[in-house]
Amino acid sequence: DHHQSTDEPSESSKPCCDQCTCTKSIPPQCRCTDVRLNSCHSACSSCVCTFSIPAQCVCVDMKDFCYAPCKSSHDD
């Protein structure tokens, strides 16, 4: 069976952020400081990764909002 490609992002690549910091300016400037392995989330346009294996990647986009937290299904 062959996989049909769709534009729907997979659940794991949906933009989300657990550690988001914003400035107090109007509009706020928000940056996600989550570290992900090998890639950034699907909506990231500026992804910076280390050269280690696995690579540790951080999205350096500046937004005026924070994405929803990633850890929704694993509440302690």
Curated annotation (Swiss-Prot):
The terms describing its cellular component in GO are: extracellular region
What InterPro entries does the annotation carry? Bowman-Birk_prot_inh (IPR035995), Prot_inh_BBI (IPR000877)
In this UniProt entry, which residues are annotated as the site Reactive bond for chymotrypsin?
Answer: 51-52
Q: SUPFAM superfamilies this protein is in?
A: Bowman-Birk inhibitor, BBI
- Signal peptide annotation: none
Pfam families, from UniProt? Bowman-Birk_leg
Instruction: Please list the GO terms describing molecular function.
Output: serine-type endopeptidase inhibitor activity
Modification note = HGGI-I, HGGI-II and HGGI-III are produced by proteolysis of the N- and C-termini of HGI-III.
* Family according to the record: Belongs to the Bowman-Birk serine protease inhibitor family.
Quaternary structure, from the entry: HGI-III exists in a state of equilibrium between monomer, homodimer and trimer, with homodimer being the predominant form. The homodimer is stabilized by the non-covalent interaction between Lys-24 of one subunit and Asp-76 of the other subunit. The homodimer is more thermostable than the monomer. HGGI-I, HGGI-II and HGGI-III exist as monomers.
The name of this protein is Horsegram inhibitor 1
In its UniProt entry, the species of origin is given as: Vigna unguiculata subsp. cylindrica (Horse gram)
